[in-house]
Regions:
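Conserved G1/Walker A P-loop phosphate-binding module
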Residues: 92-173, 191
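Conserved C-terminal guanine-recognition region of P-loop GTPase G domains, centered on the G4
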Residues: 160, 185-252, 560-561, 565
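Alpha-helical transmembrane helix bundles of large polytopic membrane transport and channel proteins
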Residues: 223, 233-385
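Extended, low-charge hydrophobic alpha-helical regions
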Residues: 356, 360-364, 383, 424-465, ...
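Core alpha-helical transmembrane segments of integral membrane proteins
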Residues: 400-500
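Hydrophobic core segments of alpha-helical transmembrane domains in multi-pass membrane transport
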Residues: 409-420, 482-487, 565-567, 581-595, ...
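Juxtamembrane inter-helical linkers in multi-pass membrane proteins
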Residues: 435, 439-443, 496-524, 601-625, ...
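Transmembrane helix-loop junctions at the membrane interface of multipass transporters and ion channels
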Residues: 551, 555-578, 744-754, 775-786
């Protein structure tokens, strides 16, 4: 029987995992789907694909195509009876220096006060970034969607200025399946941190220890932070921390990052192992008399002896290099510079092991690790009863991922978000902001007049800087409110469910459900959305998502929509704005179909993702995220937009001889805009002022408003009507929606994929924007709307 045919509510045992893609097969094994593992079918997505299973204490989603490669045996009904937990002692965890166990330590310690650097590593959704915030006081983005940490983040440990820590991306193993796994592994190998802080979710130790064993093989000083211990005890579980510490050979400190409990003790242990270079006391996890007769043990030790000199030269730990060669890791193989005879000898050793063990190399390694983990957990862990968080998540999912309720609920939630943002909360706060800024501008103008300030200087200050920057700042409340809602959806765990629900739809466009989240984040800001594509395991998926994300209307375009829709469609402002969002989505879908059949033609990408429990978003985290976005927006207003406003005012005020012009059509700006205007004339807005506003919008979309404000002297409906009709204003908005978001977004594309793709994205978006705007304009003429 195959996994894709297992009935909901049934249990079965994995017999084998088959796949032509060895990297995908290894990833499936790393996620815990090894032969002998019991799985429970939880549900199918509303459209029948993908499916959700439960194994090793957590939920995993994968597509039916991939599930069909997993053979099952022993199908039976799920055991729902109560579980009786054995008691575990409550021996107090010894303070630093009180314990009897000590890992391998260097003979001389690093001097007090010498710089120390730590790597913070762990699975996704284990509280890693929350711990990073507690350690450093830094306000990073704490989310509950797999892969929220997409770049390197550094901070200094509080009260220890000599100690810094880097928050690495959340990963499940050190196999090079995703870019994040490669980044984390190379950081530890190349930058050689003084110690690793490995954070483990105590509610699912079995799953988290898989990465821990691989980190230990790197033979670096290390301390384990056993997080969420408060949830374990609250749900009837227990962990013998002292025994766990002894079995692993690494210091283990119980903490609760969310409650800031145990952080001080963790820091003390981390500083200690770093200063004394205390490496793990254990690197070998396969017993010489194991169930395979010691075949894997002999294999790894044989390879280690063969490659020891190469590993030392390449600065790669020998044990780690040996296991990676068994896996067939190409990056490690290349780094070791092995000759053909050595490679043949290694392959012979591995083939002999497979014959003796009766299984393939990847399954043998995964079985070895999970077997060791099972023995450890069996001795020192009492699994908690089903947690309240999981019970709550199952109940909520009946609605949010239900067959008939998932998509309607999603539409209601997103509709509510946009309605509250544009029509209720954001609009009310925007009105207050407009009144305040208008009062400031009027007071400044009156003050400068009373002071007798030169008219040109007063025009620069009032008409240029204050009016231009102020017109953009009035949209700050809308942007902050939108980010607040997006943050709540992400931190609660709902974003992951959206990816699960939407996967089948996106697959028709050549994407996976995981692409949905970066594109949804793109409604807030394109830059972090593009950066978050780094979490996607497939290069095909990643590049496609980067190409399409800019079509999702970012919050920086909101001021432009709000201004023109409010001026020309006062009775239908919200519907007009929503229609723009829908156009962006439709164009993105069409572009995806075209790209998937041309530039990015290929096989569908896998969809394998953990579904975290729902959690109440942290008020502090949500508010601080909103503050960070507000701060970024204000900084942009007073830097980029300020500079753009001054430049636009200067070009609009003077002619080529630097004389003040009486007619703006004679200005430097008019000359520059006139060069581009003919290209835009077929779209209905060949006015040089419109083309100038679009050019400055490439710096920052908010600059479109400040430019129009400076050029028109006001942004009232009367002033705007001198340049647009309602119809041409809408076509202008369509072009604004689809052409490149800003220089920062193009820079993010360059950073992620290189200059060639950045140029391609820019050219692609300009072309699509022109074509769609031309179609809308032509259709309007045929319908008599022009």
């Amino acid at each position: 029987m195959k996994l894709d045919t297992l009935e909901i509510g049934k249990d079965a045992v994995v017999a084998s995992v088959a796949s032509d893609d060895q990297a995908l097969r290894q990833h499936i094994l790393d996620m815990g789907l090894t032969p002998g593992t019991e799985v429970t079918m939880m549900k199918y997505a509303p459209m029948g694909d993908p499916l959700e299973i439960r194994l090793r204490g957590y939920e995993l989603t994968l597509r039916k195509d991939d599930a069909a490669r997993i053979e099952l045996v022993g199908v039976h009904d799920t055991d729902t009876g109560p579980r009786t937990n054995a008691a575990i002692g409550t021996t107090e965890h010894p303070a630093l220096g009180e314990g009897t166990y000590s890992p391998r330590a260097a003979k001389t310690a690093v001097p007090e006060g010498a710089p120390l650097h730590f790597a913070l590593a762990g699975n996704q959704n284990c509280g890693k970034t929350t711990l990073f915030n507690q350690l450093t006081g830094s306000n990073q983005h704490v989310g509950n969607f797999p892969g929220v940490t997409v770049d390197r983040k550094d901070g200094t440990i509080r009260n220890h200025p000599e100690a810094s820590v880097t928050d690495l991306p959340g990963i499940y193993s050190l196999s090079p399946y995703t870019g994040e796994e490669i980044v984390s592994r190379q950081f530890i190998l190349d930058e050689n941190p003084d110690a690793i802080i490995d954070i483990i979710d105590a509610t699912n130790i079995e799953r988290n220890l898989y990465l821990t064993l691989q980190l230990m093989e790197l033979d670096r000083p290390m301390v384990i932070a056993l997080n969420m211990m408060d949830e374990v005890t609250a749900n009837g579980g227990a962990v013998d921390v002292n025994l766990l510490e002894s079995l692993l050979g690494v210091p283990v400190v119980p903490i609760s990052a969310a409650r800031n409990e145990g952080i001080g003790e963790l820091v003390d242990h981390a500083l200690h192992v770093a200063r004394f270079r205390e490496r793990p006391g254990r690197l070998d996890f396969c017993a010489p008399d194991g169930s395979d007769g010691g075949a894997l043990h002999r294999c790894i030790h044989g390879i280690a002896n063969l490659i020891e000199d190469h590993a030392v030269t390449a600065h790669i730990p020998v044990r780690f290099a040996a296991t990676k060669l068994v896996e067939g890791d190409e990056l490690v193989t290349e780094a070791l510079h092995l000759d053909r005879n050595e490679l043949d000898a290694i392959e012979h050793i591995i083939t002999q092991m497979e014959g003796e063990a009766g299984t393939d190399r990847l399954s043998a390694l995964a079985d070895m690790r999970f077997g060791f983990i099972g023995d450890v957990c069996g001795r020192c862990v009492v699994k908690p009863h089903e947690s309240r968080e999981h019970v709550r998540s199952v109940k909520i999912d009946r609605i949010l991922t239900g067959r008939y309720t998932a998509i309607p609920t999603f539409l209601v939630i997103m509709g509510l978000v946009f309605w509250l943002t544009f029509g209720v909360i954001g609009a009310a706060l925007q009105g207050l902001m407009e009144d305040g800024i208008a009062a400031i501008i009027a007071s400044a103008d009156a003050g400068l007049k009373a002071f007798g300030t030169n008219d040109v200087v007063r025009s620069l200050a009032v008409d240029g800087v204050l009016t231009g920057v102020g017109s953009v700042l009035t949209f700050l409340p809308i942007i902050v409110v939108l980010f607040l809602f997006l943050s709540i959806l992400e931190d609660s765990g709902y974003m992951a469910r959206v990816a699960f629900v939407m996967d089948k739809v996106l697959r028709r466009f050549g994407l996976s459900g995981r692409s949905f989240v970066p594109m949804l984040v793109g409604f807030g800001c394109t830059v972090p959305a593009i950066m978050s594509t780094r979490t996607l395991p497939s290069e095909h998926d990643r590049k496609m998502t980067v190409m399409l994300t800019p079509f999702m209307s970012c919050s920086a375009k909101l001021p432009v929509y709000g201004l023109l829709c409010g001026a020309f469609f006062p009775q239908a402002t919200v519907p007009a704005m929503v229609s723009l969002y829908l156009i962006g989505i439709v164009v993105g879908c069409i572009a995806a179909l075209v790209l998937n059949r041309t530039a990015f033609k290929g096989d569908p990408v896998p969809f394998i993702m953990e579904l975290p429990n729902y959690r109440l978003p942290s008020v502090k985290t949500t508010v601080m995220l909103a503050w960070d976005k507000a701060k970024d927006f204000i900084t942009k207003a007073f830097t980029i937009i300020f500079a753009a406003t001054v430049v636009i005012w200067f070009l609009q005020t003077f002619d080529i001889r630097f004389n003040v012009v009486a007619d703006q059509s004679q200005s430097l700006l008019a000359g520059l805009g006139s060069i581009i205007a003919p290209v835009l004339a077929p779209l209905g807005f060949g006015d040089w002022r419109a083309s100038t506003a679009l050019v400055t919008g490439l710096i920052a979309k908010e600059s479109v408003i400040s430019t129009l404000t400076v050029l028109l002297g006001a942004t009232s409906p009367a002033a705007l009507s001198t340049m647009f009709s309602p119809f041409t204003a809408y076509v202008f908005l369509v072009f604004t929606l689809l052409y490149p978001p800003c220089v920062a977004a193009i820079g993010a594309v360059k950073s992620e994929l290189g200059a060639r793709y950045a140029v391609a994205v820019f050219a692609f978006q300009v072309t699509v924007a022109w074509i769609v705007a031309f179609v809308v304009h032509s259709a309007g003429i045929l319908l008599g709307l022009a």
